[in-house]
Amino acid sequence: MKKGFRIIKFKKNKPVFELKDISKSFDGRPILKKISMEMHPGEIVGLLGPNGSGKSTLYNIIIGQHTADKGKIIINNKDISEIPIHERAKLGLGYLSQQRSVFNMSVYNNLLGICQLTIKGADEQRRVTEKLLDEFNLQHLRTINSNVLSGGEVRRLMMARIMINKPKVILLDEPMAALDPIVVQDIQKYILKIQSYGCSILITDHQVRNLFDIVDRAYVLGEQSIIADGTPNEILKSSKAIQLYFGNQYTN
């Protein structure tokens, strides 16, 4: 799936999301060193790096599972570094876990239950639920228990639930992992749909091609720090990124 001739002018907009000099150590061992990055409104940014490079730690810091030793996390000009995890969604942060994170109930009730927690009025709750069922192609699954959904169907349900809170910044953790190529293309389509709502998306994936099909830019983590950043073409010209992470994927 290619974006075609989309013209990107994100730099003229003020960043909606920023990391400023994020550092983290565990038991005296540095995991992240002065990580800085930014996303602009409507931008899709990839986060790449080999296993153990600190991607999961960085995500956990952003969502509030871990606390950075130093640095700031800024969303919509607000420093959320000290804000509890359960409050961050209210400030415009959405997160899709790599794990199968759905309730043991129907697809419809998975969505309606979240709507009832965050939206006032039963009529509006049902309206939003129906809208999301339509937009994420879930209407035919509305009465099906989420535990029997396929991997791609679960990803669509999880993405639909994220949109209930109308986030400005969304973290997607391996949303295309362990999916067939045809299903990957389908998930890419829905990621671009989320972007069309004006959301900024930070996304990880072990398959570089999957990311480069949809991202505007990417950051590469290595040696506890950012070793490369830029458009996919710029990343592929980085000798450090090629040596550390890409191997033979793009040598031809």
List the predicted regions and their residue ranges.
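Conserved ABC ATPase signature
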Residues: 145-149, 153
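The feature captures the beta-strand-to-loop junction immediately N-terminal to the Walker
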Residues: 48-50
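Conserved ABC ATPase "signature" region
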Residues: 123-141, 189-192, 240
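Conserved ABC transporter NBD signature motif
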Residues: 71-78, 91
